[in-house]
Amino acid sequence: MYTRYSYSPTLGKTYVYDNKYFKNLGAVIKNAKRKKHLEEHEHEERNLDSLDKYLVAEDPFLGPGKNQKLTLFKEIRSVKPDTMKLVVNWSGREFLRETWTRFMEDSFPIVNDQEIMDVFLSVNMRPTKPNRCYRFLAQHALRCDPDYIPHEVIRIVEPSYVGSNNEYRISLAKKYGGCPVMNLHAEYTNSFEDFITNVIWENFYKPIVYVGTDSAEEEEILLEVSLIFKIKEFAPDAPLYTGPAY
């Protein structure tokens, strides 16, 4: 027990630090890294300043060009709980089916020169029974081996929930996409199968698509599978009309 007369070993060894001259080592390192990251970010932004004069659509489907819809087939599929069913498989019976339910929009037969900028596969899903409360799920793959044979039914593993209007839309464009066609209507009219094989799949990806639901019961889904062409129309050499409005 120490008294005021006892010798204290701490006497003469007490220091007072002024925080003005000392900083936390972790804060110093973090601040240096933060400054370096900001400098690198500013340098990257300066390199992209030249792109500010261009405009792009957040969703390529809503970008410039004319959308032309080709409905391939409509049918009802039964899906069991916790599973997803293969609904689009171009290397199997889906493409080799004997009858195709084809519906072409009236505006599709374009006879002028045009270019297919992108092709979207659209799968529209609707419940066949009223008063059902569940959401649709979907998965797809684009770069499959030509010899790959997908399973008819798979387990649900990290699927995507289908968004608004219960429509699942996939862009099939390759990296340097685009497919110039001189007369799209003639190519389609001559032979539908040749048009799909020689024009579309030579320039765009072949997808496989699985669909399902998060319902705990077996559900019947009405499917409408379509190809939507994003077409770039070339401007005519001379205006069709002349006047103050043009």
UniProtKB/Swiss-Prot annotation:
Major component of the virus occlusion bodies, which are large proteinaceous structures (polyhedra), that protect the virus from the outside environment for extended periods until they are ingested by insect larvae. One of its GO terms (molecular function) is structural molecule activity. This is Polyhedrin. GO terms for cellular component: viral occlusion body. Belongs to the polyhedrin family. It comes from Heliothis zea nuclear polyhedrosis virus (HzSNPV). Pfam families: Polyhedrin. Keywords: Viral occlusion body.
